């Protein structure tokens, strides 16, 4: 009795305190860390990342790429040979080679510093904007990219990865 009680008290009370303290550290903070921050990280930022930036990337820049540059390409570039836009340097359509909008074929197929390489609209090799381009048209620094004609297939620096 005399020896048992004083020994039991110092052992029991600190253990009870330790258990309560552990529950405080592992229960409430974990709830805060897993509930509120996740709500912030998964709700508001995703809304911002998927709503406003996509609106900017898909609306305004595309409008700029389709409106102003096309206006420049339709007005200013020199025609080297053939019909409208089939130029060697600075051509806008058809068969442009360097610094032009197209290399051969239809609208927007270009080689160097151009909009696209072979085929239809926006398949670029260097500096292209859409389609199945290699550099600047899906591989490096492009908005759309490699292979499929669907929206947002880029590899490096594109709006979408694949």
Swiss-Prot record:
<protein>
    <recommendedName>
        <fullName>Larval cuticle protein F1</fullName>
    </recommendedName>
</protein>
<comment type="function">
    <text>Component of the larval cuticle.</text>
</comment>
<dbReference type="GO" id="GO:0008010">
    <property type="term" value="F:structural constituent of chitin-based larval cuticle"/>
</dbReference>
<feature type="repeat" description="4">
    <location>
        <begin position="75"/>
        <end position="78"/>
    </location>
</feature>
<keyword id="KW-0193">Cuticle</keyword>
<feature type="repeat" description="2">
    <location>
        <begin position="43"/>
        <end position="46"/>
    </location>
</feature>
<feature type="repeat" description="1">
    <location>
        <begin position="27"/>
        <end position="30"/>
    </location>
</feature>
<feature type="repeat" description="3">
    <location>
        <begin position="59"/>
        <end position="62"/>
    </location>
</feature>
<keyword id="KW-0677">Repeat</keyword>
